[in-house]
Amino acid sequence: MIKLSIINGSPKLKNSNSDFFIKELTSNMSSDISIKKFYVREILKDKTLLKGIIESDKLLIASPLYADSFPSVTLKFLEVFGEFLKENNHPQIEVYAMVNCGFFEGKQNKTALNIIEHFCNRNNLTWKFGLGIGGGEFFPNSSKTPETMATNKSLYSSLKSLRESIENNTSKENILLNPDKMSASIYRLSANMGWYISSFNKTHKIPNLRKKIY
């Protein structure tokens, strides 16, 4: 039995994009994988949870991208976890990362993945590889059956590679991806339309979207 701890770095405690990608990754995972899930906000409130994490064989850190890095709560977690690792004996845990961003291009996540790799090197953890998911807002809202959509082929192929690595201990280079069969301009257009749709749903008037607060 392989013990896998999953750290959700989203500031949200539910319905985040990170939640979605974790669910899609683990839904078809082998029964030989024992999974424990943690939220960084909960860990920072109860640091005894860190003991359960270092008892794992593998660790996955899933987080949104905030300006080439991570949310402040995730950065704080890395700081606290790093200190905990220095003070406690731990096995050679293998680490993966899954970072999603609102930008269309998956390459925007490259720096964040490098941060996790450097964290591993500094704290005697084994870095495996990570997924950098562009268009992160698109995938959770794309369909009730997103795995069948042509735009999502790269995502589900990459999730499969990550799943197989966790199950079979294979290694790969970082995978940077974005929606298939979609241009960046179409992505931006659909994202902007989302604001208008949200405005209608909340009975706000469209002109209010263009108002300035200064």
Residue ranges and their predicted role:
Residues M1-P91, S171-K172, L177-D180, I197-Y214:
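N-terminal beta1-alpha1-beta2 submodule of the flavodoxin-like/Rossmannoid cofactor-binding fold
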Residues F38-L44, S72-K76, I93-G102, G130-E137, ...:
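Low-complexity, flexible helical/coil segments
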Residues M29, L131-Y214:
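Glycine-rich phosphate/pyrophosphate-binding loop and the adjoining helix
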Residues D57, I61-A62, E117-C120, K153:
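Short, electropositive alpha-helical surface patch
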Residues E24, N28, I115, F119-R122, ...:
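Amphipathic alpha-helical segments that form well-ordered structural scaffolds
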Residues E94-T151:
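Short, glycine-/small-residue-rich phosphate/pyrophosphate-handling segment
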Residues V73-F81, K110-N114, N152-L159:
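Well-ordered, non-membrane alpha-helical segments in soluble/globular domains
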Residues V80-E83, T126, S165:
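Amphipathic alpha-helical interaction surfaces
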